[in-house]
Amino acid sequence: MLVPKRVKHRREFRGKMRGEAKGGKEVSFGEYGLQATTSSWITNRQIEAARIAMTRYMKRGGKVWIKIFPHKSYTAKAIGVRMGSGKGAPEGWVSPVKRGKVMFEIAGVSEEVAREAFRLAGHKLPVKVKFVKREAE
């Protein structure tokens, strides 16, 4: 499970998810990528579920790069607690993903295998995704 080793502040503001991703919009490490077409928070468990779905389908072939990291904490109050009396306890870790961001990359497999692996991974994620290829230099 991906979690930060240490953070400066345990509780963060939620922030806004406006616009497109500033960087990381091209395939840079592998041959094929999985790009987000909508914006959302992606939890560390969703990232891990997508990674497992891809690697199991590829059967130890190829290499996978995870280009997002859950560095933002999110909080929640316990069930049945009244409003007020401070911010809730940290509940988990998320990665804010804006549209256009390439989240995963694959190399060393055929295009058909990569497409199917990304299709399976896309079902585990809360964003709409599309398959992208590396631009020819």
UniProtKB/Swiss-Prot annotation:
GO molecular function: rRNA binding; structural constituent of ribosome; tRNA binding
SUPFAM superfamilies: Ribosomal protein L16p/L10e
CDD domains: Ribosomal_L16_L10e
Sorted UniProt keywords: Ribonucleoprotein, Ribosomal protein, RNA-binding, rRNA-binding, tRNA-binding
GO cellular component, as recorded: cytosolic large ribosomal subunit
Source organism, top-level taxon: Bacteria
InterPro entries: Ribosomal_uL16, Ribosomal_uL16_bact-type, Ribosomal_uL16_CS, Ribosomal_uL16_dom, Ribosomal_uL16_sf
An individual GO BP term: translation
UniProt similarity note: Belongs to the universal ribosomal protein uL16 family.
NCBIfam families (UniProt xref): rplP_bact
Subunit structure: Part of the 50S ribosomal subunit.
PANTHER family according to UniProt: 50S/60S RIBOSOMAL PROTEIN L16, LARGE RIBOSOMAL SUBUNIT PROTEIN UL16M
Function noted in UniProt: Binds 23S rRNA and is also seen to make contacts with the A and possibly P site tRNAs.
Name of the protein described by the UniProt record: Large ribosomal subunit protein uL16
Organism name: Streptococcus uberis (strain ATCC BAA-854 / 0140J)
